[in-house]
Amino acid sequence: MAVYYSIRPQLAEIPAPKNEDSQSSLPHIIIMTPEEAANGTFLQTNMYVKLEHSQEVRFCKAEAHKDFLYGTFVIPPKSNNREKIAFRYLIAKDRIIFIEDGGFVKHMIDKMQQAILRENPGIGFFFSDFLDMLISEDLLYLTEIENQIAHLEDEVLAGTLENFNHKIMACRRKILVCSHYYLQLSDISNILQQNDHGFFTRNELASFRLFSERVGRLHEEALMLREYSTQLREVYQAQIDIRQNKICLLYTSPSPRDPKTS
């Protein structure tokens, strides 16, 4: 069943209205399943069915349509036991609708409900807070990747080269996914800042700019990790070359002559 929140200084879950036309004038959040979205009057009016069936959720994006913003999120896994998370969203003048089928968005909003208070709440502030929550633990995750690379570096310098390529490629794949993710989030923020529909106040636009700066720093961190991993691969290759040279010398060096036979 769809879940409704009223955007107040502190987010508050509210009962579902009997029909969509009876919703209050206060800005609000709705979380619904794809099935509920396909049957919703507001979403049908705004051509959600056409959008839903014509586009597969593959990456993070935002699109400006006539009277609303529509987009998708794909959150990359940040642990070994979690798959990527995908959901859709729609932003209108007085509401934000999330379409998901797994409970991730509700979990995030429940965390925001406990942690965030705003004197002047609005849909723009809510969405910027939501974006911030998405990346709140990413620096820690990037630090974990850095520690993994540093551990590999210690192994290489100690002469332990077993499964190095497999391990470093796993790190580089994580870095690449994060790098693309941050660029996509930056694109979303840029589209929000254009404010084509006039949904957001000046202060809300400033909060999107701050998010852009945060995600930009994360992207820079990912690029530095990629460079670190590249340098480590070069060190590893140098170690391999040294070993191969020693083996070649062993087989090509003349054996010492026996003085008795000379």
Which residues are covered by each model-predicted region?
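N-terminal low-complexity segments that are often proline-rich with Ser/Thr-Pro
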Residues: 259-262
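Conserved small/polar residues in nucleotide/adenosyl-binding loops
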Residues: 251-256
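Extended amphipathic alpha-helical scaffolding segments in membrane-proximal extra-membrane regions
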Residues: 74-242
